[in-house]
From Swiss-Prot:
Protein name (record): Calnexin homolog
Subcellular location as annotated: Endoplasmic reticulum membrane
Keyword line: Calcium, Chaperone, Disulfide bond, Endoplasmic reticulum, Glycoprotein, Lectin, Membrane, Metal-binding, Repeat, Signal, Transmembrane, Transmembrane helix
Organism: Helianthus tuberosus (Jerusalem artichoke)
Organismal lineage: Eukaryota, Viridiplantae, Streptophyta, Embryophyta, Tracheophyta
Span list, region 4 X approximate repeats: 229-295, 299-356
Length: 540
């Protein structure tokens, strides 16, 4: 009895640690997520659709195909779309790490169109969200774009020249390609305080760059110190020829420029059996003049030609001619040999002068993000945007990507495992049954009292799912131990009723066991922050 009591206390302590860790993780995540849009609720009133005539495309609050999760959907083909969300407070990019992340699913593929986001800088006075269009100034443009030869994940920084005051688009060189499947993918851009940029797709690093490197951005953020002098001109006597014909060379006396390249082969002989009197083609004896043929209008009718059947067994027909062969005396046009040019000065270049627009830069002049917009002409429908996140911590975004966005990768692996490990999965079905048997026995414990009905309801709900989930089992255990805690430490006070039925909004948390196991295998030990709460969905 004493041993059982000790085990019970250990279980209680373990569950307490788990609950405390979850609370701390949630607090950390909420503080690091500057902006998060899950599209669980309708976007109307929060996201503003452009009222410009150029953007007739209709946005829809729709579920992803085969999922219970909602997103922002491009609903029609060959339409221009524009929608924007103004942030409560502009996000500064100059200090600390900033993570830009979102999910997109190309449900019908992407032949020609974009699925990128525009992170708008503060607009001029008088600008309204209803007037959002392609001229609305942005700070960063990020996301997939594909059309014709273009197939890349854009990252464009619109940077203000500190000398001229002009804004210049700086494109990331050699960006990663867009995944070609129709699954959900997470696109992440991490802007670090050391001027480093990291692009990830589904949590996997695809590109690393430095904002101040001329090898990573075109044009470079920092201009060159010198430029070619636009007023400098090449001297008239400047000789750029490295080689010249030898002026002292003469053509040899035996060099015949008129000799032909080919001559008749005088040694050739006509093959035996050659039919000199037989033509190579003859009139088709089976051809008949058409009845509607009019000689006056169509001309004299002639039978079509066919190959002479007599020539098939002979080496040839018709007049025999000697074949040609290469002329051994042929040398072609004579040219003087080339020698080094004594007057050669090299390829002329204008002299370099100090660049009047040069400036030094320790950090890019990032403009704040005041709004997030989607604006493009899409030839495909079925583009679904979801889980748009701006965070100040990489772990928050990484956790979000692993738990919410890397479904495509996890489900590919899962499907491979289902085929490979079918015998193992058959064994797991027996384990599932045993687990539910234990849970039903726990539900019959006397101390549950009034809570027994709720616990049974939750167990039955989990059992009716296609596959049980670890999340549901853990929830049941936590509820039971929470009741036990109150019984042990709550004194004589009546235990309040516990609502153990998950909220309707969070019911989809009971997702597939294999998916959860897959997520657990992919988690790394360094993850400590949790993503904003979100209903998971699966890709099929």
């Amino acid at each position: 009895m004493e041993l059982s009591r000790r085990k019970m206390c250990c279980y209680i302590q373990f569950c307490c640690f788990v609950l405390i860790g979850c609370f701390i993780s949630q607090i950390c995540a909420s503080s690091d997520a500057i902006f998060y849009e899950s599209f669980d609720e309708s976007f109307e009133g929060s996201w503003i659709v452009s009222e410009k005539e150029d953007y007739p495309g209709e946005w829809k609050h729709s579920k992803s195909e085969g999922h219970d999760d909602y997103g922002l959907l491009v609903s029609d083909k060959a339409r221009k779309y524009a929608i924007v969300k103004e942030l409560e407070k502009p996000v500064e990019l100059k200090d600390g790490t900033i993570v830009l992340q979102y999910e997109v699913r190309l449900q019908n593929g992407l032949e020609c169109g974009g699925a990128y986001l525009k992170y708008l800088r503060p607009q001029d006075a008088g600008w309204t969200a209803k007037g959002f269009d392609n001229e609305s100034p942005y700070s960063i443009m990020f996301g997939p774009d594909k059309c014709g030869a273009t197939n890349k994940v854009h990252f464009i920084l619109k940077h203000k020249n500190p000398k001229s005051g002009d804004y210049v688009e700086h494109h990331l060189k050699f960006p990663p390609s867009v995944p070609s499947d129709k699954l959900t993918h997470v696109y992440t851009a991490v802007i670090k305080p050391d001027n480093e940029l990291v692009i990830l797709i589904d949590g996997e690093e695809k590109k690393k760059a430095n904002f101040l490197s001329s090898e990573d951005f075109e044009p470079a953020l920092i201009p060159t110190k010198t430029i070619p002098d636009p007023d400098d001109k090449k001297p008239e006597d400047w000789d750029e020829r490295a080689k010249i014909p030898d002026p002292e060379a003469t053509k040899p006396d035996d060099w015949d420029e008129d000799a032909p390249m080919e001559i008749l082969d005088e040694e050739a002989e006509k093959p035996e059996g050659w039919l000199d009197d037989e033509p190579e083609e003859i009139d088709d004896p089976e051809a008949v003049k058409p009845e509607d043929w009019d000689d006056e209008e169509d001309g004299e009718w002639e039978a079509p030609q066919i190959e002479n059947p007599k020539c098939e067994s002979a080496p040839g027909c018709g007049e025999w001619r000697r074949p040609l062969k290469r002329n051994p005396a042929y040398k072609g046009k004579w040219h003087a040999p080339l020698i080094d040019n004594p007057a050669y000065k090299g390829i002329w270049k204008p002299r370099e002068i100090p660049n009047p627009d040069y400036f030094e830069l320790e950090k890019p002049n990032f403009e704040p993000i005041a709004a997030i917009g989607i604006e493009d002409l899409d030839q495909q429908d079925g583009i679904l945007f979801d889980n748009i996140l701006i965070a100040s911590d990489e772990k928050t975004a990484a956790k979000s990507g692993i738990l919410l966005g890397s479904r495509s990768l996890r489900w590919k692996k899962r499907n491979r495992r289902l085929k490979k490990n079918q015998p193992l999965l058959d064994g797991l079905k027996g384990i599932q049954k045993a687990v539910f048997d234990v849970l039903y026995k726990i539900a019959d414990l006397p101390f549950l009292g009034d809570h027994k009905v709720k616990v049974l309801e939750l167990i039955e709900k989990a059992e009716t799912q296609p596959n049980i989930t670890i999340g549901v089992i853990v929830s049941i255990i936590v509820v039971i131990f929470s009741i036990l805690l109150k019984l042990l430490f709550g004194g004589k006070k009546a235990a309040p009723k516990v609502n153990v039925v998950p909220k309707k909004k969070e019911e989809p948390e009971a997702s597939n066991t294999a998916e959860v196991r897959e997520g657990e295998e992919e988690k790394t030990e360094g993850e400590v922050a949790a993503a904003p709460r979100r209903r998971p969905r699966r890709d099929t």
